[in-house]
């Protein structure tokens, strides 16, 4: 860009899907950790349960699918990276599964946590774009760490809906990136 002081290296941002959605959307926290002291144990228990759920899902379930997506807005080139917990191939189409292990009673959940849903929507957009799909299913799988009780929330999204939502998310993130870049010393 003529007149821009920004170099190509300075304009590149690499961020995980989780960090992006947490930064833009975080306003509260679903009670998935009882205390800071038990955080390591809770994370280990959650990881074990996560793998157990994935193994139960069968042959049509691909676990830990790495995804990358490059997007450019204004002077920024953003590389978004992450791993979809699962991609399910069904006769009706593809479903992106995001698994969250929590201490909360899953029956008390009325809807997915907005940050968790945003993470799944990002993966849905990234996968639909990469595979040139018209639509995908978005599934949030919540599992109680102590009881192993599962509750799922599912919705269908067109690629157009996902793209519109994703562009809004990136636009909000770029507002911050632009401010930080232009106001840093």
Protein language model features and the residues they cover:
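A helicase ATPase "motif cassette" and its flanking acidic/Ser/Thr-rich regulatory loops
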Residues: 14-17, 167, 182-184
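Mg2+/Mn2+-dependent nuclease catalytic core
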Residues: 71-166
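Secondary-structure transition/capping residues
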Residues: 60, 64, 134-135, 177
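Metal-dependent nuclease catalytic cores that hydrolyze phosphodiester bonds in DNA/RNA
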Residues: 1-92
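Pre-P-loop entry segment of helicase/translocase ATPase cores
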Residues: 175-185
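Histidine (H) residue identity feature
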Residues: 50, 69, 116, 171, ...
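Extended, charge-rich, solvent-exposed interface segments
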Residues: 166-173
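Hydrophobic residues within well-ordered, non-membrane alpha-helices that form the packing/core
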Residues: 53-57, 127, 170
């Amino acid at each position: 860009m003529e007149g821009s002081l920004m170099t190509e290296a300075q304009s590149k941002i690499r961020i995980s899907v989780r960090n992006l959605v947490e930064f833009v959307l975080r306003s509260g926290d679903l009670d998935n950790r009882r205390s800071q002291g038990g955080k390591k144990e809770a994370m280990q228990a959650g990881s074990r349960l996560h793998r157990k759920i994935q193994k139960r899902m069968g042959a049509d379930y691909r676990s830990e699918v790495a995804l990358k997506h490059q997007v450019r807005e204004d002077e920024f080139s953003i590389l978004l990276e992450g791993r979809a917990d699962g991609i399910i191939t069904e006769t009706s189409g593809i479903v992106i599964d995001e698994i969250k292990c929590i201490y909360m009673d899953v029956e008390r959940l009325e809807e997915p946590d907005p940050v968790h849903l945003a993470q799944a929507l990002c993966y849905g957009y990234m996968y639909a774009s990469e595979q040139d799909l018209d639509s995908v299913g978005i599934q949030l799988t919540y599992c109680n760490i102590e009881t192993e009780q599962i509750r799922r929330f599912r919705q269908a999204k067109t690629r157009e809906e996902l793209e519109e939502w994703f562009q809004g998310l990136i636009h909000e993130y770029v507002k911050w990136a632009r401010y930080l870049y232009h106001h840093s010393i």
